[in-house]
């Protein structure tokens, strides 16, 4: 498997058994989609965090990844992936092309890559794009395309998308992203500033149906590039 490429992969506490315990915890927390649970079990989270934080990789907590950014906790990654595939109560959808806003360390993109044919991921911080691109290449994650750019603009050249997942919060839904959703597609994002709510928007022709779900806490979505 891909993790054998990295000398950090053989450490006992970062083994497949540890990921299995994480998956069982996700199941207990209410994640039902077996494909999402399988994806979470396959992606080695400890290889997406700094070595100093490796011992905490499978805790259900967000961790810093540098540049003022964080890797989301496993539950929220699984929850957003499940919403991207199902909506709140729907049947699981096979995903073709997915847009992620906020590449970060690449972990969520790698999970989405297990569920979709292709993932395009936008990151505003150039140094983070370079670091994560190298990591994904090392781990042979070949269907994730990291792009440096302003996430507010999405990725028009690759649209339409079956799902759009935002890994950062914004006060309102970026209209440019809604325009890039395929008919029947879903946008999942943390909505708000100080108080944030996980928001699901489904496109039905020219209409958009919005649901506001549980409270969450994400770093803010910033415009421009760095």
UniProtKB/Swiss-Prot annotation:
Enzyme's top EC category: transferase
Family annotation (Gene3D superfamilies): Vaccinia Virus protein VP39
Family: Belongs to the methyltransferase superfamily. L-isoaspartyl/D-aspartyl protein methyltransferase family.
UniProt keywords, alphabetically: Cytoplasm, Methyltransferase, S-adenosyl-L-methionine, Transferase
Function: Catalyzes the methyl esterification of L-isoaspartyl residues in peptides and proteins that result from spontaneous decomposition of normal L-aspartyl and L-asparaginyl residues. It plays a role in the repair and/or degradation of damaged proteins.
GO function terms (MF aspect): protein-L-isoaspartate (D-aspartate) O-methyltransferase activity
Active-site annotation: 72
Organism expressing this protein natively: Thiobacillus denitrificans (strain ATCC 25259 / T1)
One Pfam family it belongs to: PCMT
Catalytic activity from the UniProt record: [protein]-L-isoaspartate + S-adenosyl-L-methionine = [protein]-L-isoaspartate alpha-methyl ester + S-adenosyl-L-homocysteine
Name of the protein described by the UniProt record: Protein-L-isoaspartate O-methyltransferase
Keyword S-adenosyl-L-methionine assigned: yes
Localization in the cell: Cytoplasm
